[in-house]
């Protein structure tokens, strides 16, 4: 099984940043690819080991594995106990993730599965211009994707890094003004 986490940090001082994934990035025909897409704002992005959640973020689970949603409980808008994840099984079951008031959220970001793919849009201003937005993608099984989000969709101010997925371990990187951080556990620890 190939498991790779790709994190893309976008350093953008403007009011709006949009990244779109095409439908073919998310689906293989009518079958959702095994992937977890999580949109996170804030810098750095810390892993909250006490609650098995990704702190300071919220996002969308866009696939299933073995009949159950992958990543349940991985998303929290306050890093403690307010999950905002939802299972998405088809284009007719879209998802919108709002900012529900977590104190550590610097900007509002939403992810929605639509007919032509997923669009993430950051709106509003940063608490400080040194903060970043990161899009995290974890692929479970299948091919080993190093850069799942096409680099052509990323601005010249961005940085992109790929790190191995470490089973049963939190992985973290990125503390600078334009770097992203990511932390995941293996799927057995998510639900």
What are these regions (language model features)?
Residues 1-191:
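Surface-exposed molecular-recognition determinants
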């Amino acid at each position: 099984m190939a498991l790779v986490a790709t994190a893309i940090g976008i350093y953008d001082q403007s009011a709006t940043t949009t990244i779109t994934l095409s439908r073919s990035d998310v689906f293989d025909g009518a079958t959702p690819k095994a992937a977890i897409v999580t949109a996170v704002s804030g810098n750095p992005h810390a892993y909250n080991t006490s609650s098995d959640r990704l702190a300071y973020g919220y996002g969308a689970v866009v696939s299933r594995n073995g009949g159950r949603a992958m990543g349940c409980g991985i998303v929290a808008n306050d890093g403690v106990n307010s999950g905002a994840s939802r299972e998405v099984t088809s284009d007719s079951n879209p998802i919108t993730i709002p900012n529900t008031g977590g104190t550590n959220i610097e900007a509002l970001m939403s992810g929605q599965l639509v007919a032509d793919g997923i669009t993430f849009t950051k709106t509003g201003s940063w608490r400080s211009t040194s903060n970043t937005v990161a899009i995290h993608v974890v692929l479970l099984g299948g091919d080993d994707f190093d850069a799942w989000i096409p680099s052509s969709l990323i601005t010249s101010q961005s940085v992109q890094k790929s790190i191995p997925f470490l089973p049963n371990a939190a992985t973290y990187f990125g503390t600078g003004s334009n770097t992203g951080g990511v932390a995941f556990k293996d799927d057995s620890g998510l639900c």
